């Protein structure tokens, strides 16, 4: 064998990637994936430990970078010439596609992390040639360095593109911090090939949490469902996918029409002329993809979507000409040079009315995509589109607001917004929380309130369950939910099944009475919000439960939360935060295609928990008797409401043998191996901590005789983390 082919370390022969050794996942594809709990660690982040992006962004000269971006718009480069001499339309598409992956169901996707730089997004078919847009931006990113993230730069560039073409934008907020590795937690679908659509079932029911019709698309197929040019069918897909990213019909029409006011699509030749996407391209391409062998491979010969559409007479100027053309012509089905379905005016009308992108001597007829015509032929969309057509100022305002929502929806509350262009107007989708309006309670008041709470009729389990219900709605994906605002007492959260509404109401009444009496007794301006009191009640209960175990502990508590009102709460928007499963409370609303173990990991990831943090919280919550519905599944202790390590000790006990008691193998009995006596019952969430080898290793740490104190410390630390996940006023971002 040629010695040069052997690895200098192991002596093993190098093999093509397809022949490399099999991974654990290859051998056991159903193995629980805990890796998503350990993403984006300091090990992959090149920034210094004390790097604070919010502080760096404050140093950014926003006016200066915007001037540089305006100049870039018309600085056409030979290696990737600008259509119409203006990169604005390309940059709008880049920003749109950065933000447009967001979906409301789990809050994942969106522009908040700069993930368009990494797989799979950097290689999605719908993102073809956006690699060039980011390369065009590199000199500006290089100039301003760490003062602006790629995530912020892509959105700011989209704003500058719009402004440079005549639109007054609604505003811009910075504060998006970059990630440094691909996001592995996002479920994009099961399809194994681009543009497949196995995500549908029944009468075209789109699988949740997905918000795109095909693998590798941002929203919909512009040619129509599965490439069938049916505008009405396309309208159904549009309405479903845009709704799943929090857009109503008015916002949807504004975004489509506004976005298609600019630029063109690219389908100069057959797609077979285009090379592989960035992640599959050769090393010499240096991260670029879609190398085009047709003609010059750029400019007039560009191939991206395969469609060759110019919508308006002024592709680099804001106008309502999109509507003028949409309603001004009758349309017939044609095909692009690449063979994609599109529409042109009947009878040759409209010829020579729109400019060529690269040859000033040439003119063309306008064209539309099937999804564009949906705005004319769907009755509800058509009414809105005509209103915008007849009221250009209303259209401009609607687009500016919808664009701001599109590009900022996943940033969370306004307290995370940074920069001089943050809009003054508060919008209900921002989950507004009132500004602090009172003096904060201090150590003496905190101690007195704890004593009052513990002296009330409320149990340890009730107090801890209520605090968890309030805080654990948080999703790090879009920074929504959490204890701040006390929205637990408002619709829809107060009525969620997992929160046991009747019991919750009793708990809240007791806490509200304590709050009212305390605030009325003060003449020094100090008050306590219900949001703070809910969390404080949980902290006090944990201290009491630890004392029952023989340990005196102090659970950290930082006041400063405020109470939102029902008027500040969009019940429909908050409905997506309802847990369909919460393994920490042993709750499952219904049967789902995902296992409850997978749903636990998903919940933990949204709460930013590591595997050890998840493990210690599960063990603590079980012995504290906080299961939804007061079930005893997983309560492996003879002394409930005592914060002990009993869950771990008893789970590891070889004297217990487990057997499924339900047909679905989701409920189990644990019996004494010798006598057969029933000892415990459990769910899959409970038993996975003994079954999964990695989780069992963690359980063993907490199941040792010398681990009680470590268990308490780790549980309190993880609890405090969850209680403060939405305290951006404390964390800076």
From Swiss-Prot:
Cofactor binding: number and manner: Binds 1 heme b (iron(II)-protoporphyrin IX) group per dimer.
Annotated catalysed reactions: H2O2 + AH2 = A + 2 H2O; 2 H2O2 = O2 + 2 H2O
Skewed-composition ranges (Basic and acidic residues): 16-25
Residues the record marks as active site: 97
Family annotation (InterPro entries): Catalase_peroxidase (IPR000763), Haem_peroxidase (IPR002016), Haem_peroxidase_sf (IPR010255), Peroxidases_AS (IPR019794), Peroxidases_heam-ligand_BS (IPR019793)
Molecular functions per Gene Ontology: catalase activity; heme binding; metal ion binding
An example Gene Ontology CC term for this record: cytosol
Disulfide bonds: none
Pfam families, A to Z: peroxidase
Metal-binding is among the record's keywords: yes
Entry's EC annotation: 1.11.1.21
Cross-link Tryptophyl-tyrosyl-methioninium (Trp-Tyr) (with M-245) placement: 96-219
Cofactor needs: heme b
CDD domains reported in the protein's UniProt record: catalase_peroxidase_1, catalase_peroxidase_2
One example of a Gene Ontology biological process annotation: hydrogen peroxide catabolic process
Tryptophyl-tyrosyl-methioninium (Tyr-Met) (with W-96) cross-link, renumbered residues: 219-245
Residues bound to heme b: 260
Description of how the protein assembles with itself and partners: Homodimer or homotetramer.
Function: Bifunctional enzyme with both catalase and broad-spectrum peroxidase activity.
Family according to the record: Belongs to the peroxidase family. Peroxidase/catalase subfamily.
Protein name as it appears in the record: Catalase-peroxidase
Gene (name only): katG
């Amino acid at each position: 064998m040629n010695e040069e082919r052997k690895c200098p370390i192991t002596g093993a022969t190098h093999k093509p990637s397809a022949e490399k050794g099999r991974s654990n996942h290859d051998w056991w594809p159903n193995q629980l994936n805990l890796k998503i709990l350990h993403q984006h660690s300091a090990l992959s982040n090149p920034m210094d430990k004390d790097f604070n992006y919010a502080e760096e962004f404050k140093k950014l000269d926003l006016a200066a970078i915007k001037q540089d971006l305006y100049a870039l718009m018309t600085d056409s480069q030979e290696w990737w010439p600008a259509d119409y001499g203006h990169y604005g339309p390309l940059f709008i598409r880049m920003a749109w596609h950065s933000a447009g992956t967001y979906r409301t169901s789990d809050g994942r996707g969106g522009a908040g992390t700069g993930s368009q730089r990494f797989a799979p997004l950097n290689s999605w078919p719908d993102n073809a040639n956006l690699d060039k847009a980011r390369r065009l931006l590199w000199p500006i990113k290089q100039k301003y360095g760490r003062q602006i993230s790629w995530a912020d730069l892509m959105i700011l560039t989209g704003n500058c593109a719009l402004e440079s073409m005549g639109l007054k934008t609604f505003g811009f907020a910075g504060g998006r911090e970059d990630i440094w590795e691909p996001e592995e937690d996002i479920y994009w679908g099961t399809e194994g090939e681009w543009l497949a659509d196995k995500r549908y079932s029944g009468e075209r029911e789109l699988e949740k949490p997905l918000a795109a019709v095909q693998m590798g698309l941002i929203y919909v197929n512009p040619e129509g469902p599965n490439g069938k040019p049916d505008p009405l069918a396309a309208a159904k897909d549009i309405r479903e996918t845009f709704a799943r990213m929090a857009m109503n019909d008015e916002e949807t029409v504004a975004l489509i029409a506004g976005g298609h006011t600019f630029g063109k699509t690219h389908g100069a030749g057959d797609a077979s002329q285009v090379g592989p996407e960035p992640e599959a391209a050769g090393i010499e391409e240096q991260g670029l993809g879609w190398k085009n062998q047709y003609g010059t491979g750029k400019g007039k010969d560009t191939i991206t979507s395969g469609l060759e559409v110019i919508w308006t007479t002024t592709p680099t100027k804001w106008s309502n000409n999109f509507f003028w053309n949409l309603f001004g012509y009758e349309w017939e089905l044609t095909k692009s040079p690449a063979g994609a379905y599109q529409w042109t005016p009947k009878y040759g009308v409209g010829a020579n009315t729109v400019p060529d992108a690269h040859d000033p001597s040439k003119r063309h007829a306008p064209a539309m995509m099937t999804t564009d015509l949906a705005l004319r032929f769907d009755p509800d969309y058509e009414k809105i589109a005509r209103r915008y057509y007849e009221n250009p100022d209303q259209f401009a305002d609607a687009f500016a607001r919808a664009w701001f929502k599109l590009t900022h929806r996943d940033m969370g509350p306004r307290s995370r917004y940074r920069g001089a262009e943050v809009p003054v107007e508060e919008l209900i989708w921002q989950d507004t929380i009132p500004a602090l309006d009172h003096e904060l309670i201090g150590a003496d008041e905190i101690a007195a309130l704890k004593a009052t709470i513990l002296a009330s009729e409320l149990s340890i389990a009730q107090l801890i369950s209520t605090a968890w219900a309030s805080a654990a709605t948080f999703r790090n994906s879009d920074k929504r939910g959490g204890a701040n605002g006390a929205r637990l007492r408002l619709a829809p959260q107060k009525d969620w099944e997992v929160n046991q509404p009747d019991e919750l109401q009793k708990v809240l009444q007791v806490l509200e009475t304590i709050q009212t009496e305390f605030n009325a007794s003060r003449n020094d301006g100090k008050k306590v919000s219900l949001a703070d009191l809910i969390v404080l009640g949980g902290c006090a209960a944990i201290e009491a439960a630890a004392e029952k175990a023989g340990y005196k502990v102090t659970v950290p508590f930082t006041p400063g939360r405020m109470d939102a009102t029902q008027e500040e709460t969009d019940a429909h928007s908050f409905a997506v935060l309802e847990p369909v499963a919460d393994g920490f409370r042993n709750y499952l609303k219904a049967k789902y295609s995902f296992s409850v173990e997978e749903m636990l990991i998903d919940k933990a990831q949204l709460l930013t928990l590591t595997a050890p943090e998840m493990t210690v919280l599960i063990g603590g919550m079980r012995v504290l008797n906080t299961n939804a519905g007061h079930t005893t599944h997983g309560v492996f202790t003879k002394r409930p409401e005592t914060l002990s390590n009993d869950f771990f000790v008893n789970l590891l006990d070889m004297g217990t043998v487990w057997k499924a008691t339900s047909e679905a193998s989701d409920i189990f009995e644990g019996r004494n191996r010798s006598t057969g006596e029933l000892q415990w019952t459990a769910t899959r969430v409970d038993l996975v901590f003994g079954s999964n080898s990695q989780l069992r290793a963690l359980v063993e740490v907490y199941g040792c005789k010398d681990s009680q104190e470590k268990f308490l410390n780790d549980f309190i630390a993880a609890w405090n983390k969850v209680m403060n996940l939405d305290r951006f006023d404390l964390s800076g971002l």
